[in-house]
Amino acid sequence: MKLDLLSFSNMLYYNIIKLGEIIVKIAYVFKSNMASTFQLGTMILPQLEDNSHMVNVIGMFFFDDNIMCLQKGNPVGERLAKIAKEKKMLLMVCDQCAVRRELAEGTFEQCGSGEVKAKGLVDGVVAGCFPQLYSALGPNAPDQVITL
């Protein structure tokens, strides 16, 4: 039997859905302008909510203005916080980005130390830098990191 790539992809997709298997652990980094509004808010989050995303998202790290979607009361942030709690998903904002936007308690000198604390953000969000991200994800390391 000859199997083309499309048939193989469809078969793989069917088997993953049918068996309920999650084959890859993913961490997302939201760096590009509007990534949390567009890719997260309109694609990733709805798929996580209806369990059609097909991968196990173990963490999300937010830079620059992408952290704004995580402000308390923001509909995207509130929905994401609910999913993160259910799925035990890490939500971390860049500590320096949060300090600059008054969404963290701490100083620039404390950035990267683990001493900066998120404030005014949805439940479950922590502030940190790469050392804190690596430490938090280390015991459950992702198979892939996707930067958007």
Regions found by a protein language model. Give the residues of each.
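Histidine-anchored nucleotide/phosphate-binding helix
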Residues: 36-55
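A generic structural motif
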Residues: 53-58, 89
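Charged helix-capping and loop-helix junction motifs
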Residues: 42-45, 74-79
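A short aromatic-anchored loop/beta-hairpin motif
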Residues: 122-137
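Mid-chain, well-packed structural core segment of small domains
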Residues: 79-123
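Short, glycine-rich nucleotide/cofactor-binding loops
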Residues: 26-41, 66-73
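A short beta-strand-loop structural module common to alpha/beta enzyme folds
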Residues: 56-67
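Short, Lys/Arg-enriched N-terminal segments with co-localized hydrophobic residues
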Residues: 4-23
